């Protein structure tokens, strides 16, 4: 009986690993179908009890693997731009911009996962699939991300994604009007406006 139990446990583990691998492969394959796009989005943040913390909206431009522009317009404007090497974060309200090397930025965030779509990133997660929904749970428990969910169609269109942090705060993003196709290269460049304080952390 003990040998049977061990065999069943091993088979169960192998089946689970195969399912996770298939889900990761399907997710990457779907995202690979769209190399660049623009979409508007709405954001809703809730705390562990489900109470609303913040609602917002903005626009998103992506050209994989490393070019993106995340422009939050409400409730407070902020801009996150990657030119492929430098990651810029600009807060117009405080007139401050921060520059860091993209290679040093954490990949353990939903947006970075979507923008890069690299196999090495997806391998850090156990992934379960239910139709167009993919639920990702980090294999390592030392990060702030508890769970990441993304809904992406077979044509590569992202409909929504959400992230749950360790304190159960949930950030949900609904994408709409996704336009697949070439994006103006100017969207992936950033020059700090005159008078803005720059914190350059690339040194």
Curated annotation (Swiss-Prot):
The keyword rRNA processing does not apply. Disulfide bonds: none annotated. Keywords: Chaperone, Periplasm, Protein transport, Signal, Transport. It holds the Pfam family LolA. The keyword Signal applies. Changing residue 64 to L: Loss of ability to transfer lipoproteins to LolB. Changing residue 68 to E: Loss of ability to bind lipoproteins. It is found in: Periplasm. One of its GO terms (biological process) is lipoprotein transport. It comes from the Bacteria. Residues 1-21 form the signal peptide. GO terms for cellular component: outer membrane-bounded periplasmic space. SUPFAM superfamilies: Prokaryotic lipoproteins and lipoprotein localization factors. Belongs to the LolA family. NCBIfam families: lolA. Monomer. Participates in the translocation of lipoproteins from the inner membrane to the outer membrane. Only forms a complex with a lipoprotein if the residue after the N-terminal Cys is not an aspartate (The Asp acts as a targeting signal to indicate that the lipoprotein should stay in the inner membrane); the inner membrane retention signal functions at the release step. This is Outer-membrane lipoprotein carrier protein. It comes from Escherichia coli (strain K12). The gene is lolA.
